[in-house]
Amino acid sequence: MSDKGIEIVNLLAPKVEMLGFDLLGAEYVLVPSGAILRLYIDIPFAMQPECMVSIDDCERVSREVSAYLDLEEPISGNYTLEVSSPGLDRRLFTLEQFARHHNHLVKVGLKLQQHGSRRLQGKIVRVEQVGGFVVLLVNGVELAVDFNNIDKARIVPDWSALGLAPLEKSKHDTKKMSQGNKKPSNESAARQAVRGVIR
């Protein structure tokens, strides 16, 4: 997370917890019209997977947080608040979240190059809390990644195991699309997995 994202999480986490949710992390993105503040909330880990975040939950958190931000004013200027459930391809923001998703496949973007690259994809082998490292298995090799050097990290779901793999288009369908002069969509059924996003 950016410094601004960390500041906002520290401010809002207690408020979100009072509403019965965990604030996983925040994204603060500057855009021409001002800024976008994205908050990712989830059900407390002990209550998963029996309970899931609903759109109504996102709406309620959005209302409460918006009113709170109006009072505290941690952001100057115009901004748009978005509250979302993490989804299957969730972002990972903390070492604790990496540890919780042990043995999951992740994509990691780095601030500075490590192991010859700024982009890595591998399974989470372990988390070294003391040193602040995430150990990934990349192409059969264990690589220790400095957590402070991680810009973004996201779970890579096994769509096939979830029964959400994209269906192959038949030649007839492909030809029909071409004749209609329409660009084929890359969106798979997996992209339609439930994710509540409230603005």
From Swiss-Prot:
GO cellular component: cytosol
Compartment(s): Cytoplasm
Entry keyword annotation includes Cytoplasm: yes
Coiled-coil stretches: none
Entries under InterPro entries matching the protein: Ribosome_maturation_RimP, RimP_C, RimP_C_sf, RimP_N, RimP_N_sf
CDD domains documented for this protein: YlxS_C
Keyword annotations: Cytoplasm, Ribosome biogenesis
Feature: compositional bias, Polar residues: 177-189
Entry keyword Electron transport: no
Pfam families xrefs: DUF150_C, RimP_N
GO biological process: ribosomal small subunit assembly; translation
Region described as Disordered: spans on this chain: 170-199
Domain of life per record: Bacteria
PANTHER family: RIBOSOME MATURATION FACTOR RIMP (PTHR33867:SF1)
Function: Required for maturation of 30S ribosomal subunits.
UniProt similarity note: Belongs to the RimP family.
Protein name according to UniProt: Ribosome maturation factor RimP
Source organism (scientific name): Xylella fastidiosa (strain M12)
Protein encoded by which gene: rimP
